[in-house]
């Protein structure tokens, strides 16, 4: 896949949280406890670790616990250490909820997702929010979006 400037290629991994541990990023005490290593086990038994940082966005500002089913999204083209289990920097974390579907992707000028599985039809009453919960009134075309 070719990387376009400023566009992340999102890839997700879903599984149940088996462990959450503090991750030391440096000797700086001001960030102590701010970084977590979240271990997920997929339904097929595969294991993935996500580094959750201060800038990781949790959809709906959900708090996650051991046993929760979640999906972690990372930049598929970002460099990663060659270790087992694989370890990715979590960009977005979604706590999977019954009856709720979440799509994280780049949407083009026709509001079609990069994998062509979803086309957005925005209605007058559609809530469009920034990650901080404030309304967004601009054009949605050619952007990375989280669709719930």
Q: Language-model features: where?
A:
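Short, flexible, surface-exposed loop segments at domain boundaries
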Residues: 1-37, 59-120, 132-148
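Short, basic/aromatic beta-hairpin or loop at an interaction surface
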Residues: 39-52, 116-126
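A cross-kingdom feature marking solvent-exposed beta-strand/loop segments within repeated
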Residues: 46-62, 126-134
């Amino acid at each position: 896949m070719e990387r376009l400037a400023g566009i992340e290629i999102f890839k997700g991994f879903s599984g149940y949280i088996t462990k959450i541990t503090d991750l030391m990023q440096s000797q700086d005490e001001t960030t102590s406890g701010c970084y977590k290593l979240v271990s997920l086990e997929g339904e097929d038994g595969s294991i993935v670790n996500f580094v959750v940082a201060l800038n990781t966005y949790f959809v709906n500002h959900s708090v996650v616990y051991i046993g929760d089913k979640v999906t972690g999204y990372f930049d598929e083209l970002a460099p990663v250490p060659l270790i087992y289990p694989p370890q990715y920097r979590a960009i977005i974390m979604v706590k999977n909820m019954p009856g709720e579907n979440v799509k994280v992707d780049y949407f083009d000028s026709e509001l079609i997702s990069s994998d062509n599985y979803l086309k957005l039809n925005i209605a007058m009453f559609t809530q469009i929010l920034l990650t901080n919960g404030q309304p967004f009134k601009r054009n949605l075309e050619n952007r990375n979006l989280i669709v719930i």
